[in-house]
Amino acid sequence: INSWFALRGEWIVKRRWVVIIGFIALLAAGFYGLRFMKINDSWESYFLEDDPVLLKTEEFKAVFGNDNYAAVMTDCDNTFTKENLELIRELSNEMLDSMSYADKMTSITDIEFMIGNEEGMSIEQIVPEEIPADEAGLAEIRRKAFLKPYIANRLVSKDGRNTWVLLKLRPFPDDSVWYKGKGSVPPENLTGRELEHIIRKDKYKPLNPKGMGLPYITDQKMKWIGKEMPRIMGLAILLAIVVLIFATRSLRGVVVPVVTAIGSIVMSYGMLGYLRFSIDSGMMLIPMLLAFAVAIAYNIHVHSFFRRRFRMYGNRRQAVVDTVSEMGWPVLFSALTTFAALLSFLTIPATPMHFIGIATSTSVMLTFLIAVTVMPAVLSFGKDRQPDPKIQAAGGGWLDHRLEA
């Protein structure tokens, strides 16, 4: 096996520019594939197409329509004041008129119910069109609100501080309708953004509105991840650089592993983009962090072995060939075991777990290929130097002999 890797090492040294240009070409192809990445944070994206939960949900939608709501919880000292009721009505109307998938509104200012009177039955609104300003009129509205059990403690809290504004949504279109490539916004996220835009208006501040519902939570999740991901990746890169500086004490030993990690991530995500594989934003960081950890480990092994051989021989190209020969199989074995372990995620019947399995295992194998090709190719550049006579005479360094013992 080592002889086979030695031949690969000689090929890399002879065609180092081919290796580097090939890596750059694959990296460019990966970057291009990123434009086709499909981010889908819908809860339905967690299930496989034949999952019983998803099938039952589709049956429900076929009968009742969309099961998602855009909801707002208001929180004020007293809901039953003229000013607050007017704001709730205005908020309800704006949500119904402005949101793309609005269907039916339910709020304290929109509910009608039947009451008995001398003439039989009549249908009245809890909050009349002309909201009274006097205490008696407002007290009557409060009495009516708590008269019906399906309103009391469900739509309005006992103390009158909180109330729900619920907007039922029309069915969201299929992915083939809204997805037009990079920049396409899923209907869930669009609904969440529209709701956020409405409740953040200054005029609704007295209500202290809080957005609720899966579409709103999905959009907030995307915003949070978009804000935190650069921070986490920046911290990961910084820590990687610190570790590499201490481990390699070389510019190439720092730059190449970082490029390896970024390259494997871009290539694997680009491949998933070409395949139009749906990606959950909450899972995107896992393959990235793993790729950095694996890239640092593999490249430190390769670089450290090369440095010892280079000090022993003084011949840069010979040191590269020996490095690929001796380190190719151990690193490959490590990569294959990690690859096989990560593929076990495919046995879990959840789409995000499949993404983790495919993305992480692909990143590991790409990291291996880059570590045993690009790193040696980069290390082969430079001048030879006089071998270290002490290491040459001893046949290796102090640590080498200790490890062999």
Per-region residue spans from a language model:
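Interfacial helix-loop-helix hairpins and adjacent transmembrane helices
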Residues: I1-F23, V321, L369-A405
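Transmembrane helices with small-residue packing motifs
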Residues: V19-I20, I24-P52, T74, T347-P352, ...
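Solvent-exposed, non-transmembrane loop/terminal regulatory segments of multi-pass membrane proteins
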Residues: L34-T79, L85-E86, E135, A139-V156, ...
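Membrane-water interface of transmembrane alpha-helices in multipass transporters/channels
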Residues: E44-L48, S250-T260, L275-A291, F345-S363
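Extracytoplasmic
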Residues: E58, A62, E86, P132-L251
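Interfacial segments of transmembrane alpha-helices in multi-pass membrane proteins
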Residues: G226-I279, T347-T351
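Transmembrane alpha-helices and their membrane-interface boundaries in multi-pass membrane transporters
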Residues: Y274, A295-S304, G328-T347, P352-A394
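Helix-loop junctions and hydrophobic alpha-helical segments within the transmembrane domains
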Residues: R309-L336
